[in-house]
Amino acid sequence: MSDLDNKEVLIALLRKRSALDILKTEGWYHIPVDTAPKPWPPTAIAFYQGTVFGKEEQYKIRYFGEVDQIDIVPRKELFPDDEENAHKAEIFYYRVQLSELHQRYKPIISYRPRRLVFIPTTWAKFQLAEQINDLFDGSPLEDRLWSALKYISVLAERQWKIFVQGHKYYLDFAVFCKHGKLAIETDGYTTHYDSLNQIDYDTWRQNEIGLDGWQFLHYTSKHVKDDWTPYLSQIQRAIDQLGGTEEPEKFRRKVGEEQGKYIVDGEEPL
């Protein structure tokens, strides 16, 4: 790989085994032009393997490559024999050609099932990541809290997507406990407190999520500054009151037993 420090890396979903076969044999990946993530284009792409890859390989990021060339082509050029999706034949896609497909010596894992599509990150974070939550490139406040939570061995999930009353929300941090769910939210003072409209939205959002059974802890950069230490005991106390964290394997079994109704980080069951 060339020098990619501070460059954009895109984590993308491999929905089918055939997508990996194409990467290995032809070296390209396709993304609909209308739904391509921002920022665009990425310098490199890494691939999150969905449930179709089976127990040993699902929820892992193993393959990656540097982007060599990007073309815009209709779907019929990518898949000329795909009669099942003939109605999509004229839709335009980015064909992202990689210079070479690489494998990480140790894959990045997701402890809990996540149905994600894209995660923009940096090459520096991708190199150091051990689990998927290490990849999120949020605010400096979120990154500091994530480091602090790992230090006290709290298995939180970053940017966890939930649906409440038909609305989609992303939680900065979700902690699944034996007797409840804890949401930990962070924001910058200037972002959320200089606007009355933002205050109104945040209040409504927190009330909606709270009525869905989530307990809330909310911190701002004005409160925390550079040191999370005084707040970690409060977070740990909230977790203890909810029975402690639920082990990821138990969470996975719960999802498996309730496929029809247990929606995990997405619009549909995994």
Features from the language model and the residues they span:
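Domain-level recognition of nuclease-like catalytic cores that cleave nucleotide substrates
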Residues: H223-L270
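Acidic-and-aromatic substrate-binding clefts and catalytic sites of carbohydrate-active enzymes
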Residues: F163-K168, V224-W228
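Basic, amphipathic alpha-helical patches used to engage nucleic acids or provide basic targeting signals
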Residues: C177-L242
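Hydrophobic transmembrane alpha-helix bundles
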Residues: Y93-L101, Y193-R205, R253-E268
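Structured alpha/beta reader/binder surfaces that contact nucleic acids or chromatin modification marks
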Residues: M1-L135, S139, D143-Q159, F163-H167, ...
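Composition-driven recognition of long, C-terminal low-complexity regions enriched in serine/threonine
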Residues: R144, S153, E157, T203-N207, ...
